[in-house]
Regions:
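Hydrophobic/aromatic ligand-binding patch that stacks against planar heteroaromatic rings
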Residues: 28, 64-65, 90, 116, ...
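Generic preference for hydrophobic
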Residues: 38, 52, 75, 181-183
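Membrane-interfacial terminal anchoring regions of lipid-handling membrane enzymes
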Residues: 1-19, 36, 42-46, 198-219
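Short acidic-hydrophobic, aromatic-tinged amphipathic segments that line or gate anion-handling sites
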Residues: 38, 97-100, 189
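Catalytic core of membrane glycerolipid acyltransferases/transacylases, capturing the structured
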Residues: 2-8, 14-19, 30-32, 46-104
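Short gly/ser/thr-rich secondary-structure transition/capping motifs
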Residues: 31-39, 107-108, 163-165
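Non-catalytic C-terminal accessory region of glycerolipid acyltransferases
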Residues: 108-219
């Protein structure tokens, strides 16, 4: 069914596609002995047109947030991830943008397109680290350039703290696993309008790290 939706993506509404993805995702999580604990769902803005900025631990991150989030969203992913089986179909169903970071013109066009769509009321997720951390729950530097979409769209920024998602695909274990997805309080435009993108990045990272420490993910 996922392949059919992916092959005929324009025949279905975003709500229909998202409902299917959640159903498949939760079935896969159950089969894989993975429990997703969602925190702060009430912090997700009621009005569409916002950006998620999570820390990046691995290939499972988007699937964890998909399980936890009741509101449809899409993704800006790097080219390498867009070629991963199953994730490729998931991203197609999400109408995600695949960014080739070596192609500056293409990357700029993606930023412009996503900014336009966020202004029109779509929600997007960007990994501000640019690549996944190889140090578990310890995030890398959040890059200021990742926040250009938010500043151009003047949209709410929702920091997301992921804990232990790296264990899902990257450790090879079949033991039961619990991962945490924390939706933190949004930063609205009035709060960050006078900040540089590097300052926004540092503040979002600070909030994410604080949450990881508070909930026992800091080892």
């Amino acid at each position: 069914m996922l392949n059919r939706y992916a092959a005929n993506v324009d025949n279905y509404t975003e709500g229909e596609r998202y409902a299917l993805l959640k159903k498949i995702d939760r079935r896969a999580n159950k089969g894989g002995n993975i429990t997703v604990q969602a925190y702060g769902v009430e912090n997700i803005p009621n009005e569409n047109g916002f950006m998620f900025y999570p820390n990046h631990q691995g290939l499972y991150d988007v699937l964890a947030i998909l399980d936890a989030c009741p509101t449809p969203f899409s993704v800006v992913a790097k080219k390498e991830v867009g070629n991963v089986p199953f994730l490729r179909q998931v991203f197609t169903c999400m109408k995600a943008y695949i960014m080739d970071r070596e192609d500056i013109r293409q990357s700029m066009q993606v930023i412009l397109n996503v900014t336009k769509e966020v202004k029109e009321g779509r929600n997007y997720l960007i990994f501000a680290e640019g690549t996944r951390s190889k140090n578990g729950n310890h995030p890398l530097e959040f890059k200021g350039g990742s926040f250009k979409v938010a500043t151009k769209a003047r949209c709410p920024i929702v920091p997301v703290a992921l804990i232990d998602t790296y264990k899902a695909f990257d450790t090879g274990s079949i033991e039961p696993l619990t991962v945490q997805v924390h939706f933190l309080k949004p930063m609205y435009y009035d709060e960050y309008k006078d900040m540089k993108t590097t300052e926004i990045a540092a503040e979002v990272k600070r909030r994410v790290e604080e949450t990881i420490k508070e909930y026992g993910g800091w080892d």
